[in-house]
Amino acid sequence: HLESDSDPDQTIEAIHAAGCKAAVSVKPGTPIEQVYPYLDRLDMVLVMSVEPGFGGQKFMPAALDKIEALRKKAGSTLMIEVDGGVDAATAPLCVRAGADVLVAGSAVFGKPDRSAAISAIRAACENGESGL
């Protein structure tokens, strides 16, 4: 998390030195601009669309503005991931805003037919269906 006590520059350097890709997550209350100084060294940014800690929370629409701003600032090379409240209604909104990777925990694992849940999310994204 960007909000941790670790020095972001040192952490990113250590991750790259280990031959891995570097990513950082940003909590809902943190302005997305705080990640901008590190964009040239990051491979991915995870935009949290709920407060981290437990599943089943409602998607926070303010995350969409963060995704859009991040995509505009970083261009197409940075991967943007979204985690929290992602389902068939919110996933297309995230993709439209510029997200590349979606984490849909409760929307998949909270359903009796996980395959159907994944298919519904994919279909919604492909068809551009959305709504909060």
Question: Where is each model-derived feature located?
Answer:
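C-terminal helical cap(s) of enzyme catalytic domains, especially alpha/beta-barrels
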Residues: 15, 95, 110-132
